[in-house]
């Protein structure tokens, strides 16, 4: 039955690896439609610091699932899977190929493998956890998570109360850890997926790209964009939107906790750390074809051949 399923392409990669450029070039050759797989690009008013595709790029290749939420709102992997599947089905109905582009690996994993059934939020238990945090501190609760679920504790920072609270809540409701429950796969993706990842061969080149992009963001007005968010008064640094790399560091600057130069340096370092995590995740990914950021033409040919060969096999 697999050959009857529609084709979908995944184009993954670390930040600043050239995913957007390659995706736009591919769309100019083939009937593909782009779906963003990025937990930062979903937010309106956060354009410069997320390196969101600009107006020209959006005209060349419109991206779905960009600018869909206000920065005050949360968005889960389950929300993404629902929205991405709906977009993929629309694209296939138009006789085109969904091309999913981004660097949020959790979203790709949720889409590909489905999501395990987690218990619904419990307001009473959540309130109890928050009260404990007020009296003991989040670091003590993180130590508790470390004892019951060291895998989740390694992924969740002590200063990330939303995710830390949820991990403890899940355990207290179900008696099972978040790690145990997420190992149970949900409904698989009803598509034939060809998966690609793009990155520079050398880490130093990726670091250079990250620093260059951050400098360009500052020149483009990232500080002004951040000030507009800061002065809204309905945002705070614990929101998922403001925890995005670059935004958290610039928020600290506006809060008076560091200088602008320190915020820029910390933002670049945080982006490098994000890229390292993305690459580590991709190296453990199955059925993945690697592409070279420094050879866009060859990468484009590899993607084109994958589409052409799939068409030939379906004839």
Curated annotation (Swiss-Prot):
Monomer. SUPFAM superfamilies: P-loop containing nucleoside triphosphate hydrolases (SSF52540). It catalyses: adenosine(37) in tRNA + dimethylallyl diphosphate = N(6)-dimethylallyladenosine(37) in tRNA + diphosphate. It comes from Vibrio vulnificus (strain CMCP6). Its EC number is 2.5.1.75. GO terms for molecular function: ATP binding; tRNA dimethylallyltransferase activity. This is tRNA dimethylallyltransferase. ATP binds at residues 13-20. Substrate binds at residues 15-20. It is an enzyme of class 2 (transferase). The record marks 104, 126 as: Interaction with substrate tRNA. Residues 38-41, 162-166, 243-248, 276-283 are annotated as: Interaction with substrate tRNA. Catalyzes the transfer of a dimethylallyl group onto the adenine at position 37 in tRNAs that read codons beginning with uridine, leading to the formation of N6-(dimethylallyl)adenosine (i(6)A). InterPro entries: Dimethylallyltransferase, IPT, P-loop_NTPase.
